[in-house]
């Protein structure tokens, strides 16, 4: 019934496209007049549009004419005129939606339309893509259109200085990777002045390969971290012990990706730890003093049994490098958290890097939800439309192709074993190679790529391998995968963003010419030769059937399979796609094996035979839908928890910005001093209590620790003194201490010093708070066993932790302000710069680049007081006299000598 109604009325997408075509007619009606304009008149349209916007017009009011102008500029600059379907894609993007356009339909050119239009508002437009190569390529090629129309273009890649980034971000249109944008956002919120920040306020972002960024990478947080204690030796010891465990010592669930020790496994581990003198004889792994070891054992277990080399990670230059499960690319600089990366380093016997503590983090989900207007482009989004709508409030519109798709998607072939499957793949590749038809073989991992490569090598079939190990040649290899007799093996969607042109990509081949060694005439001759060669090969390839895409197994997501299929048949080209499966494939084995095995047994499948059966296809699709649903729930659940931290992050970042903007820090200091003075006095002199109940000794200690005040004992000895009078005197005394500092150092210097102390203290308590939230998050799921909702419990406790953090901030801030002194002799720019460099070397994000340090704040005397603010040295502390300790970090060992952390000893009640 539903299918009949769809045929009569069309789908919602069909109706949307129909409406958009009426908009396109209006743009097309403007084309004749726009074409008559001179180059100068066309450029002046930009000035005209900006004036209209300043006079009250909206972007929608000028959208049709602006699109017509960009189309004409593109025709004049590049000789490329936007097709009507590309104009539809541009309108979809401008209206804050996601446009699904097939591979080869010119998404890069489509982005110029909404980017130009929205840049006219002079608030900045970010075009976001997945790697530095695409950023450089697209900004250079499309930048010529923008420049022709009088707009500036910026390009953000890894390794740029803050000055260069600031200039690029302040361009009208900026091309950047999602990683750089996210990290720059975190770094900006760790700077000490607004002038040091590089990003503009959030406005409009167009995300290329939007499904990759908002879906595939949604669970991957961007993290800036700093080093903590070195436990590399312990990781090595535990790794050796875990290698001795038996299969019966642990249980693993591949569906849920979990692993746990069995009862016998716990006993075995305890025995091994005892023999290695890591724990005391007869003590247990879960005894209080050994609890920290559980973390090391669990991570070593995961490293050895849940993570495979050349599938989940690879080892290059003595480093463990993560492989993106969706693209097959190396995730440069990324490290697994919670000690897992160290466990993998121990497993692979490479140098174990120090663990790091999170200083700032954000997920792409929450970063991109900051934009008032967001849109995206991809070749495959309809299967994820519900998630994109639910989480990001983004509708998906599937744009029709300019040319009819002639590609043939052949039925899957299922075999009993991997060997039989590889034999069938080899036979097909041989057939294609013999007739000259190019083949692209898609695999799910580096390991599978190399298995296929070995099979082809044994059969002497020339081929190229494209995976994370050869990332540098990625774009060139994939661009030439459509040449005559080409055989290319690629991990998943490696090379995404680069079209495969039948016959080869002449522009990229021309770039390989050594221009310096040739005369102009010889160079032109070489160029013409390449163009003629690729044109001839294109004819041969079309005659052979176009690009044949072979999938070696189904991915967990139908969308990834569709992306692989989309490599063939661009712009109406011929082509074929086919998937080869076996019962050994991960998806079949974990999610669909029992049902399908039963069908195969019923049908009596013999060795070497393939089977095509509708029931198997349905089972596979159900398995994929099951996994997609499971992954969606994980991302949705992650977002629910991350929203708690995100709300707190927004508060902290907004407060931080307000502190930086503030012209006078005295008001906050004064109000906080008054609040703490009342709190301390009432703690030791409770309102309405008898005099003999007052704890004057500890009141004196606390006032000295907090405000550097020595309490006048004569005052307390008065019979009629009240807690209000003591509070008033404390506030007045503290204020006089501050005023004396102002007289000694100048009000301006004190203002900047107080502002700096407040910012650094805020950074410190926020860092500790993130650590506390991490620990809370790890164990919160256990509350379900007590019939409590983990999310509600997490929200409640996270709020309590946040309140505690704010109280801690006030106390540490006040203590530091009243105890510090400034050595005026050392206020030198050179000292500040040197100190910055030292501090930078101890900071890194997932790229481990010290230039991204939160201390990379320049050498401005108004904000840089780091080297001249003195604190009490640990050596000068008297263990028996807490008043001599000054400010003590909560995670530092208590100065009293107990061996406990300060927060569990003298700092317990803080």
Swiss-Prot record:
Q: Does the keyword Nucleotide-binding apply?
A: yes
List the InterPro entries hit by this protein, alphabetically.
Helicase_ATP-bd (IPR014001), P-loop_NTPase (IPR027417), SEC_C_motif (IPR004027), SecA (IPR000185), SecA_CS (IPR020937), SecA_DEAD (IPR011115), SecA_motor_DEAD (IPR014018), SecA_preprotein_X-link_dom (IPR011130)
What's its membrane topology?
Peripheral membrane protein
Q: Which domain of life is it from?
A: Bacteria
Chief localization class? membrane
Recorded hits in PROSITE patterns, A to Z, give: SECA, SECA_MOTOR_DEAD
Question: Where along this sequence does the record place binding of Zn(2+)?
Answer: 894, 896, 905-906
The reaction(s) catalysed by this protein are: ATP + H2O + cellular proteinSide 1 = ADP + phosphate + cellular proteinSide 2
Q: How and how many cofactors are bound, per the record note?
A: May bind 1 zinc ion per subunit.
Q: Does the keyword Zinc apply?
A: yes
Write down the EC number. Answer: 7.4.2.8
Keywords in alphabetical order, please: ATP-binding, Cell inner membrane, Cell membrane, Cytoplasm, Membrane, Metal-binding, Nucleotide-binding, Protein transport, Translocase, Translocation, Transport, Zinc
Q: Please state where this protein is localized.
A: Cell inner membrane; Cytoplasm
Which residues are ATP-binding? 86, 104-108, 499
Question: Which GO terms label this protein's molecular function in UniProt?
Answer: ATP binding; metal ion binding; protein-exporting ATPase activity
Identify the cofactor(s).
Zn(2+)
Q: Name one GO cellular component term.
A: cell envelope Sec protein transport complex
Q: What biological process terms from GO does the record include?
A: intracellular protein transmembrane transport; protein import; protein targeting; protein transport by the Sec complex
What functional role does this protein have? Part of the Sec protein translocase complex. Interacts with the SecYEG preprotein conducting channel. Has a central role in coupling the hydrolysis of ATP to the transfer of proteins into and across the cell membrane, serving both as a receptor for the preprotein-SecB complex and as an ATP-driven molecular motor driving the stepwise translocation of polypeptide chains across the membrane.
Q: How does it assemble?
A: Monomer and homodimer. Part of the essential Sec protein translocation apparatus which comprises SecA, SecYEG and auxiliary proteins SecDF-YajC and YidC.
* Membership in a protein family: Belongs to the SecA family.
Q: Write down what this protein is called.
A: Protein translocase subunit SecA
**Organism of provenance:** Rickettsia bellii (strain OSU 85-389)
